[in-house]
From Swiss-Prot:
It comes from Homo sapiens. The gene is LEAP2. Belongs to the LEAP2 family. Disulfide bonds join C54-C65, C60-C70. The keyword Secreted applies. Has an antimicrobial activity. Residues 23-37 form a propeptide. It comes from the Eukaryota. Gene3D superfamilies: 4.10.40.50. Pfam families: LEAP-2 (PF07359). It is found in: Secreted. This is Liver-expressed antimicrobial peptide 2. The lineage of its organism: Eukaryota, Metazoa, Chordata, Craniata, Vertebrata. Keywords: Antibiotic, Antimicrobial, Cleavage on pair of basic residues, Disulfide bond, Secreted, Signal. Residues 1-22 form the signal peptide.
Length: 77
């Protein structure tokens, strides 16, 4: 008789263990994170040299971004 009780307890334990193992783990979405902003100090230190790729004038050491490159002169031919 105690064999049946032990077998029933083990079956319930195995069923519960399967439920725990099969539950999904919630993932943290990376889309919700905001990118870190550079402080004015690091913006000044990390200015790009002439010829480096850029997106706007504030990224270049010469403050001239032309055709996605840091430029030395305003009108580039």
């Amino acid at each position: 008789m105690w064999h049946l009780k032990l077998c029933a307890v083990l079956m319930i334990f195995l069923l519960l263990l399967g439920q725990i193992d099969g539950s999904p783990i919630p993932e943290v979405s990376s889309a919700k994170r905001r990118p870190r902003r550079m402080t004015p100090f690091w913006r000044g230190v990390s200015l790009r040299p002439i010829g480096a790729s850029c997106r706007d004038d504030s990224e270049c050491i010469t403050r001239l971004c032309r055709k996605r490159r840091c430029s030395l002169s305003v009108a580039q031919e």
